């Protein structure tokens, strides 16, 4: 007999894990089974999709890094499903992971913002992070460049382009696309795992997305989010994305419903200012000559602020500033010319929330740690990490936890402590049964004789095996 989701919940109830209160209760609040049905993830036979995903969602909280690890741990008793059931789901190119992530994101907003109020600083935030891997046999893996690491920043992996939605209080991941960069040498490409996908399947479309450049990918993410009913006030990106075409496309969505606030490179691009056409450097010289430099005490920065004409877009506001201990001027752009410097910086600083989200996803929720060679399994792994992030984010907002890290540590510590207590209790129960059997058989127990019996040796072996297991699991 297979177990359904309610039976998994009963197992966790019996163990008294905090994970039950946090994950199973949140899944119930989200009505996760219905969300899976809405996303079109119905299976014809066997275990239900929501049952399998429920197991996968719990992996980071059970400190398990793979399906294989589940069946070598004490947690295997949580379910009777075979590991091939989980592998088949992760490797299935037909699964609409993107649709499922949107269903969870919509439900999250429905729960935390039932009035559907749009905050003044609500924003789409687009940024990328490197999912580093060891080896080159994983499907579609390439050499990617980490600009933070500089010249030595090339490594095997993927660029994970993520769209986050900031609702005024917290960020939630809406969508993502995995991108490849520099192709590997021909010899290494031959050794890579290759999979033939059904044309126009979800997995096939994901592979096509991976070949697109990041600016095109970012625009697709934003337009898809708007179609799914998300429409914030601003779009926040760094200077890498702010090409002329990108800005024009953002302003063209819903007749200019969203404004762009972004960093922009101080390069060759020209701006119209007081009848002159100037690039960034000449504009700084002109503004300095006019004595328009200001100082902001709140941010401890010197800056210029002016409205210019950007060909192909119209009037925009530029903010040219130099932070303490920096030699170069940094330039920010806003298509909302009503924003002063302080307000612009307050809105742009919201972009930092996506960096915090990346850190929490990688540090606690196993983002980028999928060990499978199958590209579909990589997509599944990222999606599940983001779903778990929203579950924990909802619990945190409802229970006033300050950080995701603090919440995760609470779950992990409680889980490990109660798991150890449960194992010791099961051991004691088994030992007690052995002693009862001996007494029942002999009527009484002679201690010296008992120490030489098979039952005593069995008890000793149980203890040694249990504590050795505890020790290795704590390493």
Cite the ranges covered by each PLM segment:
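A short, flexible helix-boundary coil/loop motif
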Residues: 1-47, 77-78, 180-182, 187, ...
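Electropositive nucleic-acid engagement tracts
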Residues: 33-47, 63-136, 140-143, 242, ...
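Domain-level cores of phosphate- or acyl-group-handling catalytic modules
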Residues: 195-275
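Active-site-proximal, Lys/Arg-enriched surface segment
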Residues: 3, 91-183, 187-192, 302-305
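Electropositive, glycine- and tryptophan-enriched low-complexity nucleic-acid-binding patches
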Residues: 63-65, 84-85, 148-232, 311, ...
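Short amphipathic alpha-helical "interface-anchor" segments enriched in bulky aromatics
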Residues: 124-130, 340-372
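Short, amphipathic alpha-helical "recognition" segments used to contact nucleic acids or chromatin
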Residues: 50-64
